[in-house]
């Protein structure tokens, strides 16, 4: 028997050549073994022949993504794993989304609010588009890849009363039917995902109550959406009405407006425009934060301290009258391992009692 062992060939080969070369690499009388971090090489590698090495404290585990999957399931995964999505094979945790808005905005929100990127956390955010969550999430299982996979999707709960009344116009009746239909699909989606994740501790779905755009405002982020009204509308009267709608406390009003804006611009472009106005003041929707904490369960004291330091710096830039003296002292102790997260949270709460970092700390305790 002949063996050919290649270690990290991507260090010496151009991206395009990697894909071409390893797609054609086949010797009938030779077993070829190669180690790689290349998404290009992973893309053209048969998923049945892939082994993932996971470094643990003082040992390594080996995962085989195709274990116990039927031929059709393997084929689905193989077709899906292109150069971008093979990132999930290398990630410490994975978040699956199905929309352009989530794919564009979530990394921006995390970076601007926490001062650290998803990449730094070891989390890959993958847009599955129309593939179907189950086709990808099936890779994460006790028998396959033992890494956490969070699914982010919409429950599409109704943003208005869908009861049809005698005086409703045809347009209003049509709108109510559409809202009711979306709600029904959302319930069906949840039922399906509940059954899929049952008994699998590596996969969990997290839901926006309505949709990403609506829940973004519900979380207290109307200001960010207001900033792009002038980009969406030209007519002064429409701009004024849109601002009034977005500032409304009624989800039926601001929900309909933000969805209208997103549809008019296209959700992807709408997200790009919105991304320019994300800041440390933007509130991370609760279901997204929960998904992040599921995808990556443990955080070193240095990462937590860096996030808190970032929040303090941003608040101090906005208001240099804030006194973080005690917080800084406790933060140093926390980095050195001489106090607990609870101690740090207590001092931070005295200075900024409403800061969202306290929610994160509470979830990490």
Q: Where are these predicted regions, by residue range?
A:
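Loop/turn-to-beta-strand initiation segments
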Residues: 2-3, 27-33
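Conserved hydrophobic alpha-helix in the ABC-type ATPase nucleotide-binding domain
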Residues: 20-21, 25
């Amino acid at each position: 028997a002949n063996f050919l062992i290649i270690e990290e060939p991507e260090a010496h080969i151009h991206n395009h050549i990697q894909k071409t070369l390893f797609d054609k690499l086949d010797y009938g009388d030779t077993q070829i073994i190669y180690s790689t971090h290349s998404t290009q090489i992973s893309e053209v590698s048969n998923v049945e022949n892939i082994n993932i090495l996971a470094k643990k404290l003082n040992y390594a585990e080996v995962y085989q993504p195709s274990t116990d999957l039927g031929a059709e399931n393997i084929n689905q995964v193989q077709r899906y794993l292109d150069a971008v999505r093979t990132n999930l094979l290398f990630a410490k945790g994975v978040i699956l989304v199905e929309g352009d808005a989530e794919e564009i905005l979530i990394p921006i929100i995390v970076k601007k609010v926490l001062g650290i990127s998803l990449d730094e956390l070891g989390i890959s955010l993958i847009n599955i588009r129309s593939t179907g969550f189950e086709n990808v999430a099936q890779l994460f299982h006790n028998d396959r890849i033992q890494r956490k996979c969070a699914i982010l999707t919409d429950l599409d709960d109704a943003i208005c009363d869908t009861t049809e009344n005698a005086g409703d116009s045809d347009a209003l009746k049509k709108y109510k039917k559409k809202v009711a239909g979306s709600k029904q699909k959302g319930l069906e989606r949840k039922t399906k995902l509940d059954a899929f994740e049952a008994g699998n501790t590596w996969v969990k779905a997290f839901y926006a109550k309505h949709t990403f755009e609506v829940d973004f405002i519900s979380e207290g982020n109307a200001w960010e959406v207001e900033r792009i009204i002038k980009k969406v509308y030209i007519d002064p009267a429409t701009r004024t009405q849109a601002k009034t709608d977005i500032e409304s406390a009624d989800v039926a009003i601001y929900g309909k407006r933000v969805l209208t804006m997103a549809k008019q611009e296209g959700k992807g472009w709408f997200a790009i425009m919105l991304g320019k106005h994300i800041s440390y003041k933007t509130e991370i929707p609760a279901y997204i934060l929960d998904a992040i904490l599921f995808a990556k369960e443990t955080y070193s004291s240095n990462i937590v301290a860096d996030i808190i330091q970032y929040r303090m710096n941003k608040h101090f830039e906005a208001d240099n009258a804030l006194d973080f003296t005690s917080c800084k002292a406790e933060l140093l102790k926390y980095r050195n391992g001489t106090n607990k997260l609870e101690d740090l949270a207590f001092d931070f709460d005295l200075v900024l009692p409403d800061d969202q970092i306290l929610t994160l700390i509470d979830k990490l305790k």
